[in-house]
Amino acid sequence: MKSINPDPNGLSIGYFFPAGRTNHVWSDEAARRTPQMNRHNLMALAQAAEDAGFDSLFIADNWSGHQRAAERGGHQAPAFHAPLLAMGIFAVTDHIGVITTLHTTHHKPAHVARMGATLDAFSGGRWGWNAVTGHSGDEAALFGEPYVEHDKRYAMAAEFVDVVQQLWREEEPIEFVGKFYRAQGRIKAPRPVQQPRPLIVSAGASPAGTAFAADWCDALVTLARTEADVRAADERLQALVAPTGRTVTSWPFAICIVRDGEGEAQEEYEQLLKSLNADAAWEIASDILGSIETAKAMFDKLGRDEAVRAIGSGSAMLQLIGTPDQVAEQLISLRRNVGAGGVLINFPLWSPRELRNFGGVLRRLEEAGVRTSPASRNYSW
């Protein structure tokens, strides 16, 4: 058995793994410099992340939506299905965790319970679940289902996770009769290695999404542009967590470029932004602003051009752009001064070189005592 991270002072560093092509910087130059999406390149990237000392890989996923301009620009689509990609990664790594996105809206609880138990057992306790409800009407249409409104999706998700956890926990058949789901019996799958259950995270920062995370998850992934935004989001989360007695931490997204020389990382970033793909960025912006509550609150007051640049450049999230020392200082501050439990790192260029560059940051974090490498500990995450 393995337990979820018991270190209250540890900062979990995840890598936003590219299941599709370029992530969160909608630049034609970034797309041009992106390697082919094939087994060799993706497995090499996963191994480089493990060698650098990352705690986890985070694989986002969706079934449909905002694809046409994105595909023309070489951005994020087509994409590999997260749980299937994870199996390949587990086969070529030993320590790094993999968090896969699985929708509550488009699965049955038994599907996720069996997939999750299999992934966790196969990996030796290295699997985590990003539980999302889905936000796209295109996805509902793809499955031939009616579109479910926002708060109802989270009410359904709470019941869904309850059923999944019962199926993981109980050796005897369960009998569950809820408002949205019914389940009777047990799954034919190995027990999860992580106890009391695998890690669960979510990324919904609306009131309903935050309440869901407080009740059912271990971490809430947040979209924040500044340390003050991270602190405010965490305070809202902790106000809901406190009555439950649970521990739920905030994991903000960050866009990151690390270079050894002063100013080199910022220069690289500016070069990428010179070829910002406005069509692809606006398609993403329109979809996000129309359906994702977190982003609507952040960008509602922006005009088209400003929203396109903010979303297309990755400036909708924290920016960690600098030397290893500079980036490490920012991460240490997020842990010590803001209370972040983790950070999800997104590189606009995905290659083993970027991960090796970030390895220097991770070593500095260990020296500062804010994290422990997964290769040297006996617990997950």
Model-derived segments and spans:
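Short, acidic/polar
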Residues: 36-49, 204-212, 323-334
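Hydrophobic, small-residue-rich alpha-helical packing segments that form membrane-like cores
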Residues: 108, 121, 137-162, 189
